[in-house]
Amino acid sequence: STEVQSLLPEAIAANTTAFLNTHDRQHPEVMGNPTEGALLLWIRGQAYDYLTLRDSAPIIRQLPFSTERKYMATLVQSAMLEGKAVLYVKGAPEILLSLCNLPTEVRTRYGAQLHQYQSRAMRTLALGYHIVESPTDQEKPLDELIQEGLQLQGIFGIMDPVRSEVPAAIQQCREAGIGVKIITGDTSGTAKEIARQIGLWGESSTD
């Protein structure tokens, strides 16, 4: 919808812990979480100034990311909605999808897209929002507001390419009898694709 599209740049700019170092304007450097930084670079490529967007949406309250809940949330006074309070949420797609009231066919389509991203070793994030109409509701715990339901803004797949020298280094370790394991917070599908790219996973491999 138009509302979903118009709020997306503000959601990315406001609900993040990352910054961009733009001293070299041709090659901005991400400061902070690289996945969050990739989203800032994406809206920058759409000709949005993330700092202007961030400054125009004052933060009311914020819920930091945690590995338990797998999302972060920021309640802002939205410039895009004439000062209304909007709660932006960003995190693991499987968590956010469960918090959105979606038709079955739409949920299935997003699930297929998510699987495609993960099978290509992409990091995945979902974004959603909740408009907080009542001043009283603004005082509620953010977790409670989130449980009231979200409007899905979209799912992002972000590629983090394997460095070219890694497969050869892995092979040298294996030839020397050194066991190599992948430890990651990503999904098993993403981990398997990364393992395939660096030579740790083949057709005969098992979980």
Where are these regions (language model features)?
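Glycine-rich, often acidic-flanked micro-motifs
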Residues: A176
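Cytosolic catalytic regions of ATP/NTP-dependent phosphoryl-transfer enzymes
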Residues: S1-Q151, I158, Q171-Q172, V180-G199
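Conserved RecA-like helicase motor-core motifs
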Residues: W201-D207
